[in-house]
C-alpha cells in the first residue's frame, strides 16, 4: 500500500509558479498546493516512494536555480490538502 508524504516549503511568492511547474513536469511525483501565496508557503504531497526524489528536486531548485525553496517541515501526510497540520 502506498503511503503519502508531504513537504511544507517556504518560498517567495514569485517562485511558487515555477516550483509548481517543475513538480508537474515530473508527472506523478507530487501535487503542489499553495498554503499562503503572500507568505510564499507551499505544500507538496507525494508518496514514500518519491519522497527522496522530491526532496532532491526542491533542494536543487534552492541551491542551483535562484529559487527560494526551503523545506521547513516534512513527514507522513496528515490528511489536509491545504496545510501541514500537527
Language-model features and meaning:
Residues 1-11:
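Short glycine-/aliphatic-rich beta-strand segments at the starts of folded cytosolic domains
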Residues 2, 25, 37, 62-64:
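A generic structural signal for short, non-catalytic loop/turn and secondary-structure boundary residues
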Residues 6, 14, 24-27, 59, ...:
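Glutamate identity and glutamate-enriched acidic tracts
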Residues 7-9, 20, 28, 67, ...:
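Intrinsically disordered, low-complexity regions enriched in small/polar residues
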Residues 11-56:
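Amphipathic, hydrophobic secondary-structure cores in small proteins
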Residues 50-86:
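C-terminal structural segments of small proteins and small subunits
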Amino acid at each position: 500500500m502506498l503511503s503519502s508524504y508531504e513537504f511544507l516549503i517556504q518560498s517567495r511568492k514569485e517562485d511558487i509558479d515555477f516550483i509548481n511547474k517543475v513538480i508537474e513536469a515530473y508527472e506523478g511525483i507530487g501535487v503542489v498546493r499553495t498554503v499562503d501565496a503572500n507568505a510564499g508557503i507551499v505544500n507538496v504531497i507525494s508518496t514514500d516512494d518519491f519522497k527522496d526524489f522530491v526532496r532532491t528536486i526542491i533542494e536543487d531548485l534552492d541551491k542551483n536555480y535562484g529559487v527560494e525553496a526551503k523545506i521547513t517541515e516534512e513527514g507522513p501526510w496528515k490528511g489536509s490538502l491545504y496545510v501541514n497540520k500537527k
